[in-house]
Design a protein with these regions (language model features):
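Phosphate/anion-contacting hairpin/loop surfaces
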Residues: 1-168
Length: 168
């Protein structure tokens, strides 16, 4: 989740939900190197470039990518170039596209608009240490406890962790 404590974070230009869905689509089976994605950013002299940006796309810094690759060596990455045209500056981030896991418990509760009210995950259904939830319209990234502890030991910026309920 986004860390609201990071003030003046860099903000990529807005994207439509359709664009986001297409970019996040699973690239497996395409056997081709994807071209970098260029996103314009809005900055000020106080702008901060955190290690994790959640919106409009889940983006990670080089440093965070290196750590996540240790837990998921087969994960495919796509370079995203954040471009500030006013200051003629570019920064490289990486699009995080973890696999979708079918791990929702029957105990999960939903609001009428299909957003999560109470999230409960099935204990044995988690294969990947970093994943998204199949069947959820919310864009959050989920991680195993070992990954969370590793991230916290290295003082990454821009992330906020929240415990998720597991099925008993």
């Amino acid at each position: 989740m986004v860390d609201e404590r990071v003030k003046n974070r860099v903000e990529p230009a807005a994207m439509s939900p359709l664009q986001v869905r297409d970019i996040l689509a699973d690239p497996q089976g395409q056997n081709q190197q994807e071209d970098p994605l260029f996103l314009a950013v809005h900055t000020s002299p106080q702008t901060v470039y955190p290690d994790f940006l959640e919106f409009p796309l889940p983006l990670v810094s080089d440093r965070m990518k290196s750590l996540l690759e240790k837990y998921m060596p087969g994960l495919e990455w796509r370079a995203v170039i954040l471009t500030d045209f006013k200051q003629a500056k570019q920064d490289v981030y990486w699009l995080l596209r973890p696999p979708m896991e079918d791990c929702l418990s029957a105990q999960t509760e939903w609001y009428p608009n299909q957003t999560l009210k109470r999230l409960v995950l099935r204990q044995g259904a988690l294969e990947s240490p970093v994943f998204r939830i199949k069947g959820s319209i919310e864009p959050h990234i989920y991680i195993h406890l070992a990954v969370a502890e590793s991230l916290l030991r290295r003082f990454f910026t821009g992330i906020r962790l929240q415990r998720v309920e597991m099925e008993a």
